[in-house]
């Protein structure tokens, strides 16, 4: 018995592949992290079959590389995602994500009275993990929120 494997999303020669994104999260990552703010080609796979997740999203950005800090900020939305650096069609570096200590300029504070919602300042949250739950503390209003509350505010 033979298996014919075919890529469902075209391979890239050089750039970044963000794989194992939970289904329905890919577009949110593109928007929040301003991944489309480039003139490079971006390929998106949505609801692709995945042995581990059932369904997954995938983002490929040609000739663009994420820093480890940028990659780790993705962990809030896609904790099991991997960020692969591609060179000459080969994976040359694979990052496994971990929660960063801070997330800046990406999320919106859910506190409607927070100055980050009305003043020209970038949002800033410190990330705290307690008993497996992730909490975010706003730098400006100093309120602490469960991470799901902050993610839904966007």
UniProtKB/Swiss-Prot annotation:
Gene3D superfamilies, A to Z? Aspartate carbamoyltransferase regulatory subunit, C-terminal domain (2.30.30.20), Aspartate carbamoyltransferase regulatory subunit, N-terminal domain (3.30.70.140)
Residues forming coiled coils: none
Instruction: Respond yes or no to whether keyword RNA-binding is given for this record.
Output: no
Q: GO cellular component annotations, sorted alphabetically?
A: aspartate carbamoyltransferase complex
Keyword flag Metal-binding: yes
Cofactor annotation: Zn(2+)
Q: Which GO terms describe its biological process?
A: 'de novo' pyrimidine nucleobase biosynthetic process; pyrimidine nucleotide biosynthetic process
Key words, A-Z: Metal-binding, Pyrimidine biosynthesis, Zinc
Q: Name one GO molecular function term.
A: metal ion binding
Pfam families for this protein = PyrI, PyrI_C
Cofactor comment text? Binds 1 zinc ion per subunit.
Q: Could you tell me which SUPFAM superfamilies the record lists for this protein?
A: Aspartate carbamoyltransferase, Regulatory-chain, C-terminal domain (SSF57825), Aspartate carbamoyltransferase, Regulatory-chain, N-terminal domain (SSF54893)
What superkingdom heads the lineage? Bacteria
What InterPro entries has UniProt attached to this entry? Asp_carbamoyltransf_reg_N, Asp_carbamoylTrfase_reg, Asp_carbamoyltrfase_reg_C, Asp_carbatrfase_reg_C_sf, Asp_carbatrfase_reg_N_sf
Q: Which residues bind Zn(2+)?
A: 109, 114, 138, 141
Q: How does it assemble?
A: Contains catalytic and regulatory chains.
What is this protein's function? Involved in allosteric regulation of aspartate carbamoyltransferase.
Q: NCBIfam families annotated for this entry? A: ATCase_reg
**Protein family per UniProt:** Belongs to the PyrI family.
Spell out the PANTHER family in the cross-references: ASPARTATE CARBAMOYLTRANSFERASE REGULATORY CHAIN
Q: What is the designated name of this protein? A: Aspartate carbamoyltransferase regulatory chain
Per the UniProt entry, what species is this protein from, by scientific name? Serratia proteamaculans (strain 568)
């Amino acid at each position: 018995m033979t298996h014919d494997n075919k890529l469902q999303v075209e391979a890239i020669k050089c750039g970044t592949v963000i794989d194992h994104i939970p289904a329905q999260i890919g577009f949110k990552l593109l928007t929040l992290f301003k991944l489309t703010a480039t003139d490079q080609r971006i390929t998106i796979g949505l609801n692709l079959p995945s042995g581990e997740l059932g369904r997954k999203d995938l983002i490929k950005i040609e000739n663009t590389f994420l820093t480890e800090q940028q990659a780790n900020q993705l962990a809030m939305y896609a904790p099991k995602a991997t960020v692969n650096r591609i060179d000459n069609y080969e994976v040359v570096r694979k990052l496994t994500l971990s929660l960063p200590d801070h997330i800046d300029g990406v999320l919106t504070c859910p506190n409607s009275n927070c100055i980050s919602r009305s003043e020209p300042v970038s949002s800033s949250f410190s990330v705290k993990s307690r008993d497996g739950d992730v909490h975010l503390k706003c730098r400006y209003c100093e309120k602490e929120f469960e991470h799901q509350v902050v993610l839904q505010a966007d």
